[in-house]
Regions:
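Bacterial N-terminal signal peptides
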Residues: 2-10
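Short hydrophobic alpha-helices and adjacent helix-cap/hinge residues
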Residues: 13-169
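Absolute protein N-terminus
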Residues: 1-2, 169
């Protein structure tokens, strides 16, 4: 029994060491980006070719998206992750995450993607009022998100039931 407890403690300690604390937030955000891709609905014309997620300003989120989620299916499409240098030249970007380190560029991206079905996700206070559709918040040590449902619908993106339930109301 004692040997089993020591083994469990060693495994738990080993797992804790494989995911650095500073990457935990990036891992959670990447998982949310994948869930947003899976549980929202885009117009039929955006359901051909790869499902593209762009990441601007956060190499940790980008690396995690590439290693864990690239090439996973989103409906009948395969998920493709692109970086900032490809975002404005891609034929279509379904989900765009803009990190707070690039918040000065939000206006440029909202102008570029106006009238296009691109879900814009951010992580700083006040971003919804500046054109973001979903914004990550840290509440009592947990990563949560708020959303602008009207903005999503105006971009022809239908929020899924799970996304609506998970969002802060």
């Amino acid at each position: 029994m004692l040997l089993g407890a020591l083994f469990l403690l060693a495994i738990t300690d080993s797992l804790a060491q494989t995911i650095p604390d500073d990457n935990t937030v990036a891992i959670i955000r990447a998982n949310y980006l994948y869930q947003f891709s899976n549980y929202n609905d885009w117009p039929a014309e955006n359901k051909k070719g790869p499902f593209v997620v762009g990441v601007v300003g956060n190499s940790d989120v980008f690396d995690i998206m590439v290693s864990k989620y690239a090439s996973k299916p989103i409906g009948s499409q395969l998920l493709k992750v692109i970086g900032a240098n490809e975002v404005l030249t891609a034929p279509h970007v379904h989900v765009l995450f803009i990190d707070r380190s690039k918040k000065a560029e939000l206006a440029k991206y909202t102008r570029e993607f106006r009238g296009v079905s691109t879900l814009i996700v951010t992580n700083w206070e006040g971003a919804l009022a500046q054109g973001a559709h979903i914004n990550f918040l840290s509440i009592d040590g947990s990563i949560r998100f708020e959303m602008n449902k009207t903005g999503m619908l105006e971009s022809a993106i239908t929020p899924g039931i799970k996304i609506l339930q998970w969002a802060i109301q």
